[in-house]
From Swiss-Prot:
This is Acetyl-coenzyme A carboxylase carboxyl transferase subunit beta. The gene is accD. PANTHER family: ACETYL-COENZYME A CARBOXYLASE CARBOXYL TRANSFERASE SUBUNIT BETA, CHLOROPLASTIC (PTHR42995:SF5). Its EC number is 2.1.3.15. Keywords: ATP-binding, Cytoplasm, Fatty acid biosynthesis, Fatty acid metabolism, Lipid biosynthesis, Lipid metabolism, Metal-binding, Nucleotide-binding, Transferase, Zinc, Zinc-finger. Binds 1 zinc ion per subunit. The lineage of its organism: Bacteria, Bacillati, Bacillota, Clostridia, Eubacteriales. It is an enzyme of class 2 (transferase). Pfam families: Carboxyl_trans, Zn_ribbon_ACC. It comes from Clostridium novyi (strain NT). Its cofactor is Zn(2+). Pathway: Lipid metabolism; malonyl-CoA biosynthesis; malonyl-CoA from acetyl-CoA: step 1/1.
Amino acid sequence: MFKINPIFKKTKYITINTSKDNNINKENIPNIPEGMWVKCDRCGKTLYKKDLDENLKVCKFCNKHYRMNAWERIDLIVDTGTFREFGENITSKNPLDFSGYEDKLKGIKEKTKLKEGVITGKGKIYGKNVVIAVMDSRFMMGSMGSAVGEKITRAVEKATEERLPIIIFTTSGGARMQESMFSLMQMAKTSAAIARHNEAGLLYIPVLTDPTTGGVIASFAMLGDIILSEPGTLIGFAGRRVIEQTIKQKLPDDFQSAEFLLEHGFLDKIVNRNELKKVLYKILELH
Protein backbone atom coordinates (compact mmCIF):
# COMPACT_ATOMS: atom_id res chain seq x y z
CA MET A 1 0.00 0.00 0.00
CA PHE A 2 1.21 3.50 -0.92
CA LYS A 3 2.38 5.48 2.14
CA ILE A 4 2.48 9.25 2.39
CA ASN A 5 5.80 10.72 3.34
CA PRO A 6 5.48 12.13 6.89
CA ILE A 7 6.75 15.52 5.75
CA PHE A 8 3.56 15.99 3.70
CA LYS A 9 1.18 15.23 6.62
CA LYS A 10 -0.68 18.05 8.35
CA THR A 11 0.46 18.79 11.86
CA LYS A 12 -2.29 18.02 14.41
CA TYR A 13 -2.33 21.20 16.43
CA ILE A 14 -3.88 24.62 16.37
CA THR A 15 -2.32 27.96 17.07
CA ILE A 16 -3.67 29.84 20.10
CA ASN A 17 -3.26 33.56 20.34
CA THR A 18 -1.56 34.17 23.67
CA SER A 19 -1.66 37.93 23.51
CA LYS A 20 -3.25 39.56 26.53
CA ASP A 21 -6.77 40.90 26.22
CA ASN A 22 -6.54 44.55 27.15
CA ASN A 23 -10.20 44.50 28.21
CA ILE A 24 -9.50 42.04 31.05
CA ASN A 25 -8.37 43.59 34.29
CA LYS A 26 -9.02 43.23 37.98
CA GLU A 27 -12.05 45.51 37.77
CA ASN A 28 -13.75 43.13 35.30
CA ILE A 29 -13.33 40.06 37.55
CA PRO A 30 -16.32 39.55 39.89
CA ASN A 31 -15.42 39.68 43.57
CA ILE A 32 -16.85 36.44 45.04
CA PRO A 33 -16.07 36.03 48.75
CA GLU A 34 -14.23 32.84 49.64
CA GLY A 35 -16.49 30.17 51.16
CA MET A 36 -19.71 31.51 49.62
CA TRP A 37 -20.21 28.30 47.63
CA VAL A 38 -19.71 24.70 48.74
CA LYS A 39 -19.43 21.60 46.56
CA CYS A 40 -21.23 18.61 48.08
CA ASP A 41 -18.72 15.80 48.49
CA ARG A 42 -21.44 13.18 47.97
CA CYS A 43 -23.50 14.31 44.96
CA GLY A 44 -21.13 16.92 43.55
CA LYS A 45 -23.76 19.68 43.43
CA THR A 46 -22.72 23.25 44.14
CA LEU A 47 -24.48 24.68 47.18
CA TYR A 48 -24.87 28.26 48.32
CA LYS A 49 -23.33 28.29 51.80
CA LYS A 50 -26.14 30.41 53.26
CA ASP A 51 -28.77 28.01 51.90
CA LEU A 52 -26.85 25.04 53.33
CA ASP A 53 -26.74 26.65 56.77
CA GLU A 54 -30.44 27.53 56.65
CA ASN A 55 -31.18 23.90 55.74
CA LEU A 56 -29.47 22.77 58.97
CA LYS A 57 -26.28 21.90 57.08
CA VAL A 58 -28.04 19.22 55.04
CA CYS A 59 -27.62 18.99 51.25
CA LYS A 60 -31.02 19.57 49.64
CA PHE A 61 -30.10 17.36 46.69
CA CYS A 62 -28.77 14.16 48.33
CA ASN A 63 -29.57 14.59 52.05
CA LYS A 64 -25.90 14.53 53.04
CA HIS A 65 -25.74 15.60 56.70
CA TYR A 66 -22.73 17.81 57.31
CA ARG A 67 -21.26 18.21 60.78
CA MET A 68 -22.68 20.69 63.26
CA ASN A 69 -20.88 22.11 66.26
CA ALA A 70 -22.17 21.65 69.81
CA TRP A 71 -23.87 25.03 70.17
CA GLU A 72 -25.63 24.64 66.83
CA ARG A 73 -27.07 21.33 68.02
CA ILE A 74 -28.19 22.83 71.31
CA ASP A 75 -29.94 25.66 69.45
CA LEU A 76 -31.61 23.08 67.20
CA ILE A 77 -32.86 20.73 69.93
CA VAL A 78 -33.36 22.72 73.14
CA ASP A 79 -36.22 25.18 73.61
CA THR A 80 -35.01 28.76 73.21
CA GLY A 81 -33.76 30.29 76.44
CA THR A 82 -34.03 27.12 78.54
CA PHE A 83 -30.49 25.72 78.32
CA ARG A 84 -28.37 26.09 81.44
CA GLU A 85 -24.80 24.87 81.13
CA PHE A 86 -22.99 23.18 84.01
CA GLY A 87 -19.50 21.74 84.39
CA GLU A 88 -18.08 24.40 82.09
CA ASN A 89 -14.97 24.86 84.24
CA ILE A 90 -13.85 21.23 83.93
CA THR A 91 -10.89 21.26 81.54
CA SER A 92 -8.09 18.93 80.49
CA LYS A 93 -4.71 18.86 82.20
CA ASN A 94 -1.52 17.12 81.14
CA PRO A 95 -1.10 14.31 83.71
CA LEU A 96 1.58 12.51 81.70
CA ASP A 97 3.54 15.62 80.63
CA PHE A 98 2.90 14.66 77.02
CA SER A 99 5.07 16.83 74.78
CA GLY A 100 3.16 19.62 73.03
CA TYR A 101 -0.21 18.67 74.54
CA GLU A 102 -0.68 21.87 76.55
CA ASP A 103 0.16 24.07 73.56
CA LYS A 104 -2.24 22.10 71.39
CA LEU A 105 -5.04 22.50 73.93
CA LYS A 106 -4.38 26.22 74.17
CA GLY A 107 -4.53 26.65 70.39
CA ILE A 108 -7.76 24.66 70.04
CA LYS A 109 -9.41 26.58 72.86
CA GLU A 110 -8.56 29.88 71.18
CA LYS A 111 -9.76 28.66 67.79
CA THR A 112 -13.05 27.04 68.88
CA LYS A 113 -13.87 29.19 71.92
CA LEU A 114 -14.58 25.91 73.74
CA LYS A 115 -13.04 24.75 77.00
CA GLU A 116 -13.47 21.02 76.25
CA GLY A 117 -14.82 18.59 73.67
CA VAL A 118 -18.28 18.32 75.24
CA ILE A 119 -20.89 20.78 76.52
CA THR A 120 -23.22 19.63 79.30
CA GLY A 121 -26.33 21.23 80.75
CA LYS A 122 -30.06 21.14 81.43
CA GLY A 123 -32.84 22.32 79.16
CA LYS A 124 -36.29 21.63 77.81
CA ILE A 125 -37.55 19.93 74.67
CA TYR A 126 -41.07 21.18 73.99
CA GLY A 127 -41.38 21.79 77.72
CA LYS A 128 -39.92 18.43 78.82
CA ASN A 129 -36.99 18.74 81.24
CA VAL A 130 -33.88 16.89 80.14
CA VAL A 131 -30.14 16.72 80.81
CA ILE A 132 -28.13 17.00 77.62
CA ALA A 133 -24.49 16.47 76.64
CA VAL A 134 -23.24 17.43 73.19
CA MET A 135 -19.78 16.49 71.92
CA ASP A 136 -17.96 18.73 69.43
CA SER A 137 -15.66 17.31 66.76
CA ARG A 138 -13.81 20.63 66.41
CA PHE A 139 -12.11 20.04 69.78
CA MET A 140 -9.43 17.41 69.09
CA MET A 141 -11.94 15.43 67.01
CA GLY A 142 -14.18 14.96 70.03
CA SER A 143 -11.63 12.63 71.60
CA MET A 144 -12.45 11.44 75.12
CA GLY A 145 -9.92 12.47 77.71
CA SER A 146 -10.32 12.68 81.48
CA ALA A 147 -12.20 16.00 81.31
CA VAL A 148 -14.69 14.79 78.69
CA GLY A 149 -15.29 11.60 80.67
CA GLU A 150 -15.74 13.55 83.90
CA LYS A 151 -18.23 15.99 82.34
CA ILE A 152 -20.31 13.19 80.83
CA THR A 153 -20.22 11.21 84.09
CA ARG A 154 -21.37 14.22 86.11
CA ALA A 155 -24.14 14.91 83.59
CA VAL A 156 -25.41 11.33 83.94
CA GLU A 157 -25.16 11.51 87.74
CA LYS A 158 -27.09 14.79 87.77
CA ALA A 159 -29.80 13.20 85.63
CA THR A 160 -29.95 10.27 88.06
CA GLU A 161 -30.09 12.53 91.11
CA GLU A 162 -32.88 14.68 89.64
CA ARG A 163 -34.62 11.68 88.03
CA LEU A 164 -34.40 13.14 84.54
CA PRO A 165 -33.79 11.56 81.13
CA ILE A 166 -30.44 12.25 79.50
CA ILE A 167 -29.64 12.72 75.82
CA ILE A 168 -26.03 12.52 74.63
CA PHE A 169 -25.02 13.62 71.12
CA THR A 170 -21.86 11.69 70.31
CA THR A 171 -19.11 12.51 67.85
CA SER A 172 -15.61 11.28 68.48
CA GLY A 173 -12.44 9.85 67.04
CA GLY A 174 -12.03 7.75 70.20
CA ALA A 175 -9.80 7.93 73.26
CA ARG A 176 -7.39 10.86 73.57
CA MET A 177 -3.94 9.35 73.07
CA GLN A 178 -2.15 12.15 74.95
CA GLU A 179 -3.77 10.93 78.19
CA SER A 180 -3.21 7.19 77.66
CA MET A 181 -4.74 5.14 80.51
CA PHE A 182 -6.38 8.21 82.04
CA SER A 183 -8.37 8.41 78.82
CA LEU A 184 -9.19 4.70 78.60
CA MET A 185 -10.52 4.55 82.17
CA GLN A 186 -13.25 7.03 81.16
CA MET A 187 -14.91 4.20 79.23
CA ALA A 188 -15.54 2.31 82.46
CA LYS A 189 -16.43 5.42 84.45
CA THR A 190 -19.07 6.69 82.01
CA SER A 191 -20.51 3.20 81.53
CA ALA A 192 -20.85 2.71 85.30
CA ALA A 193 -22.70 6.02 85.66
CA ILE A 194 -25.11 5.04 82.89
CA ALA A 195 -25.69 1.65 84.54
CA ARG A 196 -26.75 3.41 87.76
CA HIS A 197 -29.01 5.73 85.75
CA ASN A 198 -30.58 2.68 84.12
CA GLU A 199 -31.07 0.90 87.46
CA ALA A 200 -33.06 3.94 88.61
CA GLY A 201 -35.50 3.28 85.75
CA LEU A 202 -34.56 6.42 83.84
CA LEU A 203 -34.30 7.03 80.09
CA TYR A 204 -31.04 7.43 78.20
CA ILE A 205 -31.00 8.31 74.48
CA PRO A 206 -27.68 8.51 72.63
CA VAL A 207 -27.80 10.27 69.25
CA LEU A 208 -24.87 9.13 67.12
CA THR A 209 -23.49 11.76 64.73
CA ASP A 210 -20.66 11.64 62.23
CA PRO A 211 -18.22 10.24 63.20
CA THR A 212 -18.67 8.13 66.35
CA THR A 213 -15.76 5.73 66.75
CA GLY A 214 -13.20 4.18 69.09
CA GLY A 215 -13.60 4.25 72.85
CA VAL A 216 -16.81 6.27 72.71
CA ILE A 217 -18.65 3.71 70.58
CA ALA A 218 -17.21 0.97 72.83
CA SER A 219 -18.69 2.58 75.93
CA PHE A 220 -21.54 5.03 76.58
CA ALA A 221 -22.56 5.60 72.94
CA MET A 222 -24.07 2.12 72.59
CA LEU A 223 -25.63 1.76 76.05
CA GLY A 224 -28.84 3.66 75.37
CA ASP A 225 -32.40 2.50 75.88
CA ILE A 226 -33.17 3.82 72.41
CA ILE A 227 -30.22 4.49 70.09
CA LEU A 228 -30.71 7.06 67.33
CA SER A 229 -28.41 8.21 64.55
CA GLU A 230 -28.28 10.78 61.80
CA PRO A 231 -28.14 9.48 58.19
CA GLY A 232 -24.74 8.50 56.84
CA THR A 233 -22.97 8.55 60.20
CA LEU A 234 -19.66 6.69 60.37
CA ILE A 235 -19.95 4.31 63.34
CA GLY A 236 -17.29 1.82 64.36
CA PHE A 237 -14.53 0.85 66.75
CA ALA A 238 -11.42 0.10 64.69
CA GLY A 239 -10.68 1.48 61.24
CA ARG A 240 -11.86 -0.29 58.10
CA ARG A 241 -8.37 -1.14 56.83
CA VAL A 242 -7.28 -2.48 60.22
CA ILE A 243 -10.26 -4.86 60.28
CA GLU A 244 -9.71 -6.03 56.69
CA GLN A 245 -6.03 -6.73 57.38
CA THR A 246 -6.92 -8.63 60.55
CA ILE A 247 -9.68 -10.86 59.18
CA LYS A 248 -8.22 -11.08 55.65
CA GLN A 249 -11.59 -10.32 54.09
CA LYS A 250 -13.08 -7.52 52.00
CA LEU A 251 -15.76 -5.59 53.90
CA PRO A 252 -19.03 -4.35 52.35
CA ASP A 253 -18.97 -0.82 50.90
CA ASP A 254 -21.50 0.44 53.45
CA PHE A 255 -19.75 -1.21 56.40
CA GLN A 256 -19.67 1.00 59.54
CA SER A 257 -22.43 3.26 58.22
CA ALA A 258 -25.56 4.07 60.22
CA GLU A 259 -27.64 2.34 57.56
CA PHE A 260 -25.58 -0.86 57.85
CA LEU A 261 -25.90 -0.88 61.64
CA LEU A 262 -29.65 -0.27 61.49
CA GLU A 263 -30.05 -3.20 59.10
CA HIS A 264 -28.13 -5.45 61.50
CA GLY A 265 -30.01 -4.41 64.63
CA PHE A 266 -27.49 -2.12 66.32
CA LEU A 267 -29.59 1.05 65.96
CA ASP A 268 -33.25 1.69 66.66
CA LYS A 269 -33.85 4.50 64.19
CA ILE A 270 -32.12 6.83 61.73
CA VAL A 271 -33.59 10.31 61.99
CA ASN A 272 -33.20 13.27 59.64
CA ARG A 273 -31.93 16.38 61.38
CA ASN A 274 -35.07 18.43 60.73
CA GLU A 275 -37.20 15.75 62.45
CA LEU A 276 -34.90 15.05 65.39
CA LYS A 277 -36.44 17.35 67.99
CA LYS A 278 -39.95 15.99 67.34
CA VAL A 279 -38.74 12.38 67.51
CA LEU A 280 -36.91 13.01 70.78
CA TYR A 281 -39.99 14.67 72.26
CA LYS A 282 -42.19 11.74 71.23
CA ILE A 283 -39.82 9.28 72.94
CA LEU A 284 -39.68 11.44 76.08
CA GLU A 285 -43.48 11.65 76.14
CA LEU A 286 -43.90 7.88 75.77
CA HIS A 287 -41.48 7.21 78.60
